[in-house]
């Protein structure tokens, strides 16, 4: 007798369920997407014990006809495609016909549905077996309940996480569906507590406010772009609003939430040096395209996609974000703590200021540079890589013994308070309508960010604090500037231009510098010698596993040539293939940091003024190359509020 046998349908469904139904969040995703495909405008999601005990989805969609109810629970039965051509023109969220039979095979499922023009159908299925089927009175739409998930697959149940973790997975997927379809009203309940309610009015910004808070919604930048193949809309936060993971970025393709690393990378590239290292924005991008340009049939979960014009799409995203940030004011405001206003107060007043809590004032160590005391120690000037700026009548190099190491940068005032996702919020059902109306009113009060351009206004120096922070003013209020970050931005744009030049002016080293590598590293570098010349690394083979450097570009910071060569080589050997664009970027960032003034260096008034004027000429005077803020703004009103001059 042969060893190969055909599996029965029940076992096949159990195997298929392993890919489609990984956890309760998978069930919620598939059932809610079915409701959206059925043209629902209102969907309720009820959970017990994070969906492990019970998941109930109620919608007002088209419903299922009686004759289709049994067929819907057979494998690969669907109403969404008819032939192979439809597979390349998919506009619906579901199409594989695997979700319902997979869910029914690992749970106890009850279905009540009606198309509205005939009696409804009541269906009970346990572990894939039909227990009961009958006609019933029902309104138009579908009410489906999934209980005792994984009751017949204890191995899968054993690997479920805690209630809190599983609930977090569900809320995450519901949030992203809500962003994808703001035209659908979604209600999410857990153990009879309402966690989310969206109005379904089509305003995605209101949905974002419901999920991430009003304060985050105030910091959103609208994104719009269109090409022959793609239409992009959405919102991303200002660079001052960041999170520690990419989980707060959502990408939607033709109404479908997808996980795509290259799309997230394109969003990050759009920010370029505006983001601190290891920080990520909150973002929502909706991309519309011809279904022929995207393959959604990659995995049964339908979260992965492939694009046929990926590079064009990535370039459009990057350029759109970069253009948007060039049009807006990026100086973060340092807010004032105010008591929470009562609901009957003006909503507009709630939106005027951030609620960042100021630190208690202490006695400042501020140097007033206008009247320098002759007895005090002569201040150290800024180092001058490539003569970026020169204070008048001062030509001398600072004694290195007096230059302290740069301290770890800590902003004296945080630009914005961290706003975690609110995973659970209890809503009183009696206040439901009032809460939604209030949210709608608040979102309406969020004004579009002023498009004032990227110009930094003139700043007039007041003094210097701890040899690290510069205080300046203008008619807009008080500005605090990190002097190291400011010159780092100036130097970065200078070096970025130099590293990118084809013809390099070189200077000979007095003694050739030798670099010893492992054989693997040597072979990797040897392949890229011509490319490395483009970033100022002129290497000659010296022996079997060594190179020597005889010259370097003249714009290398003086006294740090060999250190820069070592760090650039370290970047090269870490990469399997040299990315010249990335290497140029890293080289410019590294040299700008090394060539800039450090903390605890006191400057003259002329030096401070020259630094601020040079900063104004940069293309991005708001963040250093590492993404840290250069300056923080206190408006005159905020200062008056702080000192109780206004109430």
Curated annotation (Swiss-Prot):
Q: Does the keyword Transmembrane apply?
A: no
Gene Ontology terms for molecular function = ATP binding; ATP hydrolysis activity; ATP-dependent DNA damage sensor activity; mismatched DNA binding
GO BP terms: namely: mismatch repair
Q: Which CDD domains does its entry note?
A: HATPase_MutL-MLH-PMS-like, MutL_Trans
From the record, give the cysteines joined by S-S bonds: none
Keyword annotations: DNA damage, DNA repair
For this protein, the record's Pfam families field holds: DNA_mis_repair (PF01119), HATPase_c_3 (PF13589), MutL_C (PF08676)
GO CC, sorted alphabetically, is: mismatch repair complex
Its domain of life? Bacteria
> What function is annotated for this protein?
This protein is involved in the repair of mismatches in DNA. It is required for dam-dependent methyl-directed DNA mismatch repair. May act as a 'molecular matchmaker', a protein that promotes the formation of a stable complex between two or more DNA-binding proteins in an ATP-dependent manner without itself being part of a final effector complex.
Entry's family note: Belongs to the DNA mismatch repair MutL/HexB family.
* Name this polypeptide is given: DNA mismatch repair protein MutL
UniProt source species? Bacillus cereus (strain G9842)
Question: Its encoding gene is what?
Answer: mutL
